[in-house]
Amino acid sequence: MIWNRKTRYTPYEQWPATKLPQLVAQARQSKWRMQHHIQPTSGLLNDPNGFSYFDGQWHLFYQVFPFGPVHGLKSWQHVTSKNLVDWHDEGLAIRPDTPYDSHGAYTGTALPIDDQLFIMYTGNVRTADWQRESYQLGAWMDTDNHIKKLSRPLIAHAPAGYTSSFRDPDLIRNDHGYYALIGAQTTTEIGAILVYFSKDLTTWTCQGELNVPANARGYMIECPNLVWIDQQPVLLFCPQGLSQATIPYQNIYPNMYLVADQLNLAQAQFTEPHALTQLDDGFDVYATQAINAPDGRALAVSWIGLPEISYPTDRENWAHCLSLVKELTLKDGHLYQNPVAAVDDLRTTAHDLVFEQQRATVAALNGSFELLLTVPADKTVTVNIADQQESGQLQVTVDANHGQVMIDRRHTGNSFAEDYGQTRQVELTAHKTIKIRLIIDVSVFECYIDNGYSVMTGRFFLNATPSRLNVQGDTTAVTGKVWEWRQSEHTGVDNNETKIK
């Protein structure tokens, strides 16, 4: 397939009827299909959208282009869950079928209001001369998952002084009404977050620009997301073009967070924003969406993928996945991330690490498993994740002497994104015990360090299913356990074809 403007934006109904079933069948045959991470049945998945709890279950949407591993004509795919682990595919929910989203239904969020779910999202439109127009749109979903779009945009254009790069509304409700944080770019190409207010979800007025520190803006801010943890505001966002002088990062675009003491939305003012911090220290996290659950917990899910990067699965006409759902907590102003408790229910058979001659091996694993490892102060060990033939490996080095964790994907057998480096490293306190929780799901890893103080996430592509784990090095007093995971009960991952309704 030659991907150009015409093929990327061909209306779905103009594709041959046989095309989508062929792509779904091709993706199902991939050795890199995951068991527990949400992934597209075909084509490209990107940003998580509309994460919410409504009508007794969790709802999550994601952007998808079903016809290829490229950023084309985007829709929202819909999945639901009772436990945040097992997801059911509800099919395509929002399609690009109006004059205001004709070239893609882009990122947005959702709020349960009475017996409906209100959705606010960005509609992408291209003019005849391919100029961008961005509309902030609204829709209502009922308890039968039927969606009715509003006939007119909620916000028809960016205010004066801002470009048409104006997208990704984050809905917030408080005692005064409704707010929306919208990613933006000034006409001088500086990233911004605009704050809008509405009393009725229909008429919206701009309250001004959120006082994000000047060195944290880049040239465009995408995917702003606000949650409260212990009554403190936490802003997650993606400042494209962020200066390396502000904070060093290796990925093409970073996903960052800011904690502040207080936030006055009416005045668009943070009080005492803390230091800008990278949300994930791995290779592939972007566009994280976070919400406050009905019980107050802050929950987040990330796109494990990056714009403008080619992945090995592109050759199979599918790309990317979402992270496991993570719970966010604060301690001493630092954001901790850990998988939600229901992830523990995936565990089945346990294997204690038994070391012989400074090495322990667990074999015959089924591709999805986790390692809990404790490395005492001044010890260094290396964890290797390999296929049965050990033709390639993902390597995790835990150095409790220098206080470092490094992940190396140079030798997996299928390299990609090499321009951005094949190793990532987290710096911790030297001469202290380090604990890691390493989750492997066929072609994705999530590594939680010191109870979620740091997280490293990424894709890796072995030549066959990961089935061997070994730990070696100075293993004196090192302890660990490997848990196999049960097979997926997801119908939202691989057991359902994309429904185009």
UniProtKB/Swiss-Prot annotation:
It is an enzyme of class 3 (hydrolase). InterPro entries: ConA-like_dom_sf, GH32_Enzymes, Glyco_hydro_32, Glyco_hydro_32_AS, Glyco_hydro_32_C, Glyco_hydro_32_N, Glyco_hydro_beta-prop_sf, Suc6P_hydrolase. The active site is at D47. Its EC number is 3.2.1.26. It catalyses: Hydrolysis of terminal non-reducing beta-D-fructofuranoside residues in beta-D-fructofuranosides. The keyword Hydrolase applies. It comes from the Bacteria. Keywords: Carbohydrate metabolism, Glycosidase, Hydrolase. GO terms for biological process: sucrose metabolic process. The keyword Hydrolase applies. Pathway: Glycan biosynthesis; sucrose metabolism. GO terms for molecular function: beta-fructofuranosidase activity. Belongs to the glycosyl hydrolase 32 family. NCBIfam families: scrB_fam. This is Sucrose-6-phosphate hydrolase. It comes from Pediococcus pentosaceus.
